[in-house]
UniProtKB/Swiss-Prot annotation:
Has an important function as a repair enzyme for proteins that have been inactivated by oxidation. Catalyzes the reversible oxidation-reduction of methionine sulfoxide in proteins to methionine. It comes from Mycolicibacterium gilvum (strain PYR-GCK). Pfam families: PMSR. Keywords: Oxidoreductase. This is Peptide methionine sulfoxide reductase MsrA.
Amino acid sequence: MSDHKRAVLAGGCFWGMQDLIRKQPGVVSTRVGYTGGQNDHPTYRNHPGHAEAIEIVYDPAQTDYRALLEFFFQIHDPTTKNRQGNDIGTSYRSEIFYVDEEQRQIALDTIADVDASGLWPGKVVTEVSPAPDFWEAEPEHQDYLERYPTGYTCHFPRPGWKLPKRAEV
C-alpha cells in the first residue's frame, strides 16, 4: 500500500466519475465524498461550498497522474463553470485537488494541453487547489452505478479522444 499514490478530482456528480475512473488500469480503489467546502463532516444534504469529488488510490507502476487527468478531462466537460449536464451549482464544479507540488505542476501542464488541443469548444475553467480534508460520502453513494447500472450519470468516455501534449499540437 505504501507504494500507492492518491488523487482527488471533482468533475460533476460523483456517481459517474467513480463508475468510469475505478475501471481504469492501475486504479486500486476509489471512494466518493466531499471536499473544498466550509464545514466538517459534510453530508449530501449539508455540504456548503464542498465539491462532490472522488478520491483515487492508484499504483504508479501501472498508471500515472497525467493518465488519470487525461481521462478526467475526457469524461467531463471542463469548460462549463459549476455545471455538468443537468447538475448545476458549485457542488458540480471541475476542480483538481493536488496532494503535492508535482501533482500541481502536472495539473497545470495538462490544463494547458487541453486548452491548446481544441478538443473542447471553450477554455478550461477547472480550478487547481491544494487538497483539503476529504470527507467520505454516505454508503448509499459509494459505487452507486455498480449497484444501479441504469442510474443517472452525465459522464461518458469519448471514443477516439486523445490529448496531445502542446509540443505535438
